[in-house]
A protein has these predicted regions:
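Hydrophobic/aromatic-rich core segments of domains that either
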Residues: 81, 85, 104-157
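N-terminal accessory/pre-domain segments preceding catalytic cores
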Residues: 1-71, 78, 87-95, 112-113, ...
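Acidic, low-complexity glycine/serine/threonine-rich segments
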Residues: 98-102
Length: 157
């Protein structure tokens, strides 16, 4: 029996404090809020396919501007701060932020700071579940660190 067959159980994705130990840096909250609202508007008005293509295009255009080495302390600080900022501002908006909006917004915010994330959507068969998350350097940001082993990725940007 593989680890993926164990799955992640009855998963209710929320902003668990255990995954957001870092306080957001000053100034990042407003950018996080703008990014979250823009992502929600794009998904609501243009749909999933357009939002995914938009993220692909943004990542392709920003690939040349990635400048922080993944092992630097500044890189790690920005990653943790961005994940915490999106989680915090998600509590301010008048709608429930799901994993898709959170992960797309986090990916966009990281790209704007010169960090290249990997956006993933994965599934498990039983109980059927799909979930979106973000990784940087093989580490899950703002979510269960065991997701890559417990879910089968079907989309990666």
């Amino acid at each position: 029996m593989s680890v993926r067959e164990h799955g992640i159980g009855d998963y209710e994705w929320r902003f668990a404090r255990q995954f957001h130990q870092t306080a957001p840096a000053r100034g990042i909250r407003l950018r996080a809020l703008q990014t979250l609202l823009w992502t929600k508007a794009l998904l609501s008005t243009r749909g999933f396919h357009t939002a995914m293509n938009s993220l692909r295009a943004l990542k392709a255009t920003r690939a040349d501007s990635i400048h922080l080495p993944p092992e630097s302390s500044e890189h790690k600080r920005i990653c943790a701060s961005a994940a915490a900022a999106i989680a915090e501002v998600a509590l301010w908006v008048p709608y429930r932020v799901e994993c898709l909006e959170y992960s797309m917004s986090l990916s966009r915010l990281l790209l704007s700071h010169g960090i290249c994330p990997t956006f993933r959507i994965g599934v498990q068969r039983y109980d059927f579940l799909s979930h979106a998350w973000v990784e940087v350097g093989g580490q899950v940001l703002g979510d269960d660190p065991n997701l890559p082993e417990r879910m089968c990725p079907i989309v990666e940007i």
